[in-house]
Design a protein with these regions (language model features):
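Extracytosolic ligand-binding ectodomains
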Residues: 1-228
Length: 228
């Protein structure tokens, strides 16, 4: 099953691509339930329809606030499918009032996991925690990469302070479509003419603290990166 926000380009775009790929691979989508920004305060109807359809996995291409509502509602009704989301769900453990134990087994695709043991990630996490007192999620990592990729594009194309906005824009477009960038959210990243970035996704799953020999991104849960 799928629950998505039809009023949001991010959510509806992923839904459309997922639906096409599922059909190509012969996977059955037993139900696809939509909501909009105007009626997202109560998603019990969408959850109930997935449950009635017998969906064993529910794909959630949505943001963490709405995802927390769905997991809470499913728990109240005894519905226990596998929930799988995307990078917009990163941050669900920080939703005020959300019972984080409900995130056990939740899987999502995200370009960044704060538990990663590479030197670049750990240096960023340490500096971020020292500055802001909390663990960064993928939104923070994306913002970091935006700034430093732009910096690289500026250096490689020779942008100067005396250029006007349109000149700088054209230079940056040239830079992004011709360079390769190594950042927190991926290595060897490239951009096409439309601005779409190419990088490998990471699939992670929330594990209870102590359930695996893993560093914990945010107790009581760990981010366990799953191999592709």
């Amino acid at each position: 099953g799928i629950i998505y926000d039809s009023s949001d380009a991010y959510s509806s775009g992923i839904y459309a691509k997922f639906k096409t790929e599922a059909e190509t691979k012969g996977l059955e989508i037993v139900t696809a339930e939509a909501f909009t920004s105007d009626n997202k305060s109560d998603l019990s109807t969408q959850v109930a329809k997935c449950q009635e359809a017998g969906a064993e996995l529910v794909f959630l291409p949505i943001y963490y606030t709405e995802a927390s509502q769905i997991l809470t509602t499913a728990n109240k009704t005894g519905y226990e499918p596998i929930f799988f989301g995307c990078d917009g769900m990163d941050g669900i453990l920080d939703v005020e009032g959300f019972d984080t134990s409900l995130a056990e087994g939740l899987m999502l695709l995200t370009p960044f996991a704060a538990d990663a043991q590479d030197e670049k990630t750990q240096a960023f996490v340490s500096a971020y925690v020292a500055a802001y007192g909390e663990t960064p999620n993928q939104f923070a990592a994306d913002a970091y990469d935006v700034i430093y990729s732009m910096y690289q594009a500026v250096l490689e194309t020779g942008v100067t302070g005396d250029m006007d906005a349109s000149e700088i824009c054209e230079q940056l477009k040239t830079g992004y479509t011709s360079m390769t960038f190594d950042g927190l959210t991926g290595t060897g990243m490239t951009w096409d003419a439309s601005g779409a970035v190419s990088k490998d996704p990471k699939a992670i799953e929330f594990w209870p603290m102590g359930a695996a020999d893993l560093p914990c991104q945010q107790p009581p849960f760990c981010y366990a990166q799953r191999k592709k």
